[in-house]
Amino acid sequence: MARGPKKHLKRVAAPKHWMLDKLTGVFAPRPSTGPHKLRECLPLIVFLRNRLKYALTGDEVKKICMQRFIKIDGKVRVDVTYPAGFMDVISIEKTGEHFRLVYDTKGRFAVHRITVEEAKYKLCKVRKITVGVKGIPHLVTHDARTIRYPDPVIKVNDTVQIDLGTGKIINFIKFDTGNLCMVIGGANLGRVGVITNRERHPGSFDVVHVKDANGNSFATRISNIFVIGNGNKPWISLPRGKGIRLTVAEERDKRLATKQSSG
């Protein structure tokens, strides 16, 4: 039996949303252990080389990182396989660019540029609330942050807004019907809509019904829901398409319309 950590990842076994081609190599970068799961993260090397095209090879990415140019959530990261994940803010000071990792409606991480103001905070979903040693209350977020002494009104599934400079909670959104949310797992990954209803199933998974801006309704498990705004107003800027998934026919019509208007 193999002992110790796994250090390799075959290219065909890598997550589909990294969009690596099969034939350019045998292996893929295996993400380091970190705040996001292997299948739900995007290693820094894939973001810099395959998405932004700032490097051609892994060696070049290493040289960029080792010069301490790349910050994730306000902290310098030199590990090329660091697992960046949903809602992380990637800053490149040399170019003055800031990106937030959010899903597009195809379930992939979009290269979504944000302003300097927006890069100062991130949203985190509350996964768990516990009482620690000496009765100190803690909350644990989706990106493995532990925050002590949170506001007692904050409960599991709520979303907290965190200042990346201090790591403190500056605001929060309750998980409630009528609030805007993004789906972060399952078949509806990347869709954005308003929570219309929550079905409680004790002993099983609670189901949440969501309605998007086009009026289409869908349902998913509560664990896949990430609240991103109070009422209809999102607290973060959304990528192109605003989280509205089009059917194949709608996509075709939209493509033809843009073709005719440009032609």
Curated annotation (Swiss-Prot):
<keyword id="KW-0687">Ribonucleoprotein</keyword>
<dbReference type="InterPro" id="IPR036986">
    <property type="entry name" value="S4_RNA-bd_sf"/>
</dbReference>
<dbReference type="InterPro" id="IPR041982">
    <property type="entry name" value="Ribosomal_eS4_KOW"/>
</dbReference>
<dbReference type="GO" id="GO:0006412">
    <property type="term" value="P:translation"/>
</dbReference>
<keyword id="KW-0694">RNA-binding</keyword>
<dbReference type="InterPro" id="IPR013843">
    <property type="entry name" value="Ribosomal_eS4_N"/>
</dbReference>
<dbReference type="GO" id="GO:0019843">
    <property type="term" value="F:rRNA binding"/>
</dbReference>
<protein>
    <recommendedName>
        <fullName>Small ribosomal subunit protein eS4</fullName>
    </recommendedName>
</protein>
<dbReference type="GO" id="GO:0003723">
    <property type="term" value="F:RNA binding"/>
</dbReference>
<dbReference type="Pfam" id="PF00467">
    <property type="entry name" value="KOW"/>
</dbReference>
<dbReference type="InterPro" id="IPR018199">
    <property type="entry name" value="Ribosomal_eS4_N_CS"/>
</dbReference>
<dbReference type="Pfam" id="PF08071">
    <property type="entry name" value="RS4NT"/>
</dbReference>
<keyword id="KW-0699">rRNA-binding</keyword>
<dbReference type="InterPro" id="IPR032277">
    <property type="entry name" value="Ribosomal_eS4_C"/>
</dbReference>
<dbReference type="Pfam" id="PF16121">
    <property type="entry name" value="40S_S4_C"/>
</dbReference>
<keyword id="KW-0689">Ribosomal protein</keyword>
<comment type="similarity">
    <text>Belongs to the eukaryotic ribosomal protein eS4 family.</text>
</comment>
<dbReference type="InterPro" id="IPR013845">
    <property type="entry name" value="Ribosomal_eS4_central_region"/>
</dbReference>
<dbReference type="InterPro" id="IPR014722">
    <property type="entry name" value="Rib_uL2_dom2"/>
</dbReference>
<dbReference type="Pfam" id="PF00900">
    <property type="entry name" value="Ribosomal_S4e"/>
</dbReference>
<dbReference type="InterPro" id="IPR000876">
    <property type="entry name" value="Ribosomal_eS4"/>
</dbReference>
<dbReference type="InterPro" id="IPR002942">
    <property type="entry name" value="S4_RNA-bd"/>
</dbReference>
<feature type="domain" description="S4 RNA-binding">
    <location>
        <begin position="42"/>
        <end position="104"/>
    </location>
</feature>
<dbReference type="GO" id="GO:0003735">
    <property type="term" value="F:structural constituent of ribosome"/>
</dbReference>
<dbReference type="InterPro" id="IPR005824">
    <property type="entry name" value="KOW"/>
</dbReference>
<dbReference type="InterPro" id="IPR038237">
    <property type="entry name" value="Ribosomal_eS4_central_sf"/>
</dbReference>
<dbReference type="GO" id="GO:0022627">
    <property type="term" value="C:cytosolic small ribosomal subunit"/>
</dbReference>
